[in-house]
Amino acid sequence: MIIVTGGAGMIGSNIVAALNAEGHDDILVVDDLTDGHKIANLADLSIADYLDKDDFLTRIEAGALGRIEAVFHQGACSTTTEWNGKFMMEVNFAYSKRLLHACQAPRVPFLYASSASVYGGGSEFREEPALERPLNVYAYSKKLFDDYVRRTVFDTDHSQVAGLRYFNVYGPREAHKGAMASVAFHLFNQVERGENPRLFGAYDGFGPGEQSRDFIHVGDVADVNLWLWKRGSSGIFNCGTGRAQPFRAIAETVIDTLGKGEIEFIPFPDHLKGSYQSFTQADMSRLRAAGYNGQFRTVETGVRDYVEWLKAQRSS
């Protein structure tokens, strides 16, 4: 059995889809379906079972789930604007620690979601503690778990443990995320409503729409997860493309693909000032050194593919 926590979420469901494509369907999805809209992400996928996240943790700690091939731990509170630190630490840190230890004794491969948000406002994006400066409680919860893994696992005899620091992920199966869905998703919907796509104006030394991130298609993220599992590599790895591109490039690709719209700039929101990453670009040296030679989609290619997927979903 393969377990995917957060399996009804964006990245988790795309990992399930990638596993299905390789012939795996003995998959246990773990999630919190209080928001039942996430079921749409699983409707076209093949899984063997589902467990609520709390029931699952009790059962795996008791050794009651039988033979497990791997755990892809994608479940988390990923709302970067959430400032309830108690809730965030319980969900992202305490839960992850318990699951990590439940996987160690039976030597179950454990691949988990970290985040590029741990780098905060820094200008270098390598997997080194000195470069990690989280700007919000979400980022801190992710950094703290990475530090815990470094301190308690990597210097011991351990089963595979791999953390993937996701940069800006976009692509299919993210509609349930609402405000936290990708910029590509929101710009597509704005244009489809007959509005102009809106981007932030000048901020933090960047011109209008020129704030830049390392945008990675969720299909490429799923590919990296499966490759690492098969490779058996342990460590903390950046998961981006290695190339920063401006938000303007996303808007231009949406406009070009849909054949309508004109970029409109809005003032940078006050509530994001001081906790916003204006630039990210993954240093991919560690993942490449581990042997990964897969290619990553550019914004122009990946966003075009995504917009076509969204159009097909609308018409179906």
UniProtKB/Swiss-Prot annotation:
One Gene Ontology MF term: ADP-glyceromanno-heptose 6-epimerase activity
Gene3D superfamilies: NAD(P)-binding Rossmann-like Domain, UDP-galactose 4-epimerase, domain 1
Membrane-crossing residue ranges in chain numbering: none
Cofactor(s), by name: NADP(+)
Keyword Isomerase tagged: yes
GO biological process, alphabetically ordered: ADP-L-glycero-beta-D-manno-heptose biosynthetic process; carbohydrate metabolic process
Active site positions, chain numbering: Y138 (proton acceptor), K177 (proton acceptor)
Binding positions (NADP(+)): M10, I11, D31, D32, K38, K53, Q74, G75, A76, C77, S78, K142, V169, K177
Pathway the protein acts in: Nucleotide-sugar biosynthesis; ADP-L-glycero-beta-D-manno-heptose biosynthesis; ADP-L-glycero-beta-D-manno-heptose from D-glycero-beta-D-manno-heptose 7-phosphate: step 4/4
Enzyme class: isomerase
E.C. numbers: 5.1.3.20
InterPro entries, sorted: Epimerase_deHydtase, Heptose_epim, NAD(P)-bd_dom_sf
This protein's UniProt keywords: Carbohydrate metabolism, Isomerase, NADP
Superkingdom to which the source organism belongs: Bacteria
Binding site for substrate: N168, A179, H186, F200, G201, A202, Y203, R213, Y276
Reaction catalysis annotation: ADP-D-glycero-beta-D-manno-heptose = ADP-L-glycero-beta-D-manno-heptose
Cofactor note: Binds 1 NADP(+) per subunit.
Stated role: Catalyzes the interconversion between ADP-D-glycero-beta-D-manno-heptose and ADP-L-glycero-beta-D-manno-heptose via an epimerization at carbon 6 of the heptose.
The record's note on its domains: Contains a large N-terminal NADP-binding domain, and a smaller C-terminal substrate-binding domain.
Family of the protein in this entry: Belongs to the NAD(P)-dependent epimerase/dehydratase family. HldD subfamily.
Subunit (UniProt): Homopentamer.
Listed HAMAP family: Heptose_epimerase (MF_01601)
PANTHER family: ADP-L-GLYCERO-D-MANNO-HEPTOSE-6-EPIMERASE, NUCLEOSIDE-DIPHOSPHATE-SUGAR EPIMERASE
Protein name as catalogued: ADP-L-glycero-D-manno-heptose-6-epimerase
The encoding gene: hldD
